[in-house]
Amino acid sequence: MRILILGAGKMGSFFTDVLSFQHETAVFDVDPKRLRFVYNTYRYTTLEEIEEFKPELVINAATVKYTLDAFHQVLPALPKDCIISDIASVKTGLKEFYDQCGFRYVSTHPMFGPTFANLDKLSTENAIIISEGDHLGKIFFKDLYQNLGLNIFEYTFDEHDETVAYSLSIPFVSTFVFAAVMKHQDAPGTTFKRHMKIAKGVLSEDDYLLQEILFNPRTPAQVEGIRTELNELLDIINKKDCLLYTSPSPRDGATS
């Protein structure tokens, strides 16, 4: 299959590495310097090159801020029978775009990234495939993610957004609070060091991604839940009430 990957960033390079030995791949990026670090693939910077390549599948690996812009830029150069796809973690506006774009589509969310995941060992990681997508496109990504050892779930766009609001907003907000109140420690304990490592990783994420997660309409309810639990915990601490305190544990089905 001829596969065009949009964006030569970390995830774009990852998908290129995974796919280039079994498929004919090309990577498109408006910044030629970013293409220096992708191998065993065609490297494109113009729409004319895309037209000549005639991709059968497009994987949009641009950062969240530019996902829709990248689609709009390349659509005129694509064959009408091409399947377009995204791997965005935040899918704001994508369903509306797909409904009117005139192309078959598939939308997925590999729920791992280069910040924390070991990309060589993904058996503990998850991926979501959006159920509204094209049947053949979903089969392609299901096979790909199974070969990577990922745990696969199929959700609607709405179910995906609800899951992301829970699984991303809670740890991100908790990390922001930790980073805001923590002080430098010359001799930190193990737990502190682990939290600090996570905080540095989260705060190094793309600013637009953090904004989209925080401003997700479903995020305020999750933050309210955190505030309620903190208020109850503070009340227990102030009263020194051992009977009220029970060590919290992850709820069934919760993931970190």
Predicted segment positions?
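NAD(P)+-binding Rossmann beta1-loop-alpha1 motif at the extreme N-terminus of oxidoreductases
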Residues: 1-42
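Active-site regions of enzymes building and remodeling cell-envelope glycoconjugates
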Residues: 39-47, 102-105
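Rossmann-like NAD(P)-binding element
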Residues: 49-71
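ADP-ribose/adenylate-binding Rossmann-like module
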Residues: 78-93
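Rossmann-fold dinucleotide-binding core
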Residues: 90, 94, 98-151
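An accessory alpha-helical subdomain
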Residues: 154-247
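Single conserved hydrophobic/aromatic residue that forms the stacking wall/gate
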Residues: 245-256
